[in-house]
Amino acid sequence: MKKKRVLTGDRPTGKLHLGHWIGSIMNRLQLQNDSRYDCFFIIADLHTLTTKTRKEEILQIDNHIYDVLADWLSVGIDPEKSAIYLQSAIPEIYELNLIFSMLTPLNHIMGIPSIKEMARNASLNEESLSHGLIGYPVLQSADILLAKAHLVPVGKDNEAHVELTRDIAKTFNRLYGEVFPEPDILQGELTALVGTNGQGKMSKSANNAIYLSDDAKTVQEKIRKLYTDPNRIHATTPGRVEGNPLFIYHDLFNPHKEEVEEFKTRYRQGCIRDVEVKARLAEEINLFLNPFREKRSELVAQPKFLEEALQQGTEKMRTVARETMEEVHDHLGLSRKWRTILASSK
């Protein structure tokens, strides 16, 4: 049976954190190791430009790409099983994005909730939204359809992006002939992990993240400062467990479930100090992160391996991209005669 192609990835904005692990990485590892799927993982550096256009920000992207590569491979993304590629190294993406932009009504894009969220996160008002930021869902559609992905793992907040991609595929296929599969949403990406400050999801920009590469001392310090129940002034004050980051993290990263339930009971009764519960959490998170940190140290010491992993996956995607665009041009028919003449004169 032919494998279904899966496309997912990250913008290279820095090191990955526990929120990435919970929100996407666990699911990606399951997909990679499932023989029914052929996984393509994109490092979406072009998407970084939607909110980061200052020269100093752009120059940081090279290092961030190394960070993403090192983090992916340290947690088990395998370049022998999956294609890891760099978005900007695939020139066909630019071309397909332009073609799709001609087929996509603006009101379809502006109805996507994440456009406004990205603008808020970048402190942009409506008047200062760039053409690229408004159009980035179309660029995402080009990423997905160029790879001819059948499945796209996303959370609830990004389902509208895949729906737009399906609409674009339908429009192209109806106007010019069948080229693109209509990708399905693959449920499995989990709810965002709350940040260490208890305010919104864990993210680099909010400075509330525990990184997969944080050393043990850093993890201990971040857990020591972890937001808990603000109404619990003393250890003898009964505390709230529900929605408390301290116990959200314990539920996710402490495998000793009986211990966690005992902590919850004593916390509700005011019979245990925050510092005790936090100390155990820090121990378990460090145990969880140890193999990733060790593997990452090995990978960082051999950058050539990281470069070859990216080169290998990018070459695979280039082959797919060329084949897809040949079909696009055949069906679109744009300047077909002259393209043939110019190609034969080389």
UniProtKB/Swiss-Prot annotation:
Signal peptide: none annotated. InterPro entries: aa-tRNA-synth_Ic, Rossmann-like_a/b/a_fold, Trp-tRNA-ligase, Trp-tRNA-ligase_bac-type, Trp-tRNA_synthetase. GO terms for molecular function: ATP binding; tryptophan-tRNA ligase activity. It is an enzyme of class 6 (ligase). L-tryptophan binds at D143. ATP binds at R11, P12, T13, G19, H20, G155, K156, D157, L193, K201, M202, S203, K204, S205. A motif ('HIGH' region) lies at residues 12-20. PANTHER family: TRYPTOPHAN--TRNA LIGASE, MITOCHONDRIAL. Belongs to the class-I aminoacyl-tRNA synthetase family. This is Tryptophan--tRNA ligase. It comes from Chlamydia trachomatis serovar D (strain ATCC VR-885 / DSM 19411 / UW-3/Cx). The gene is trpS.
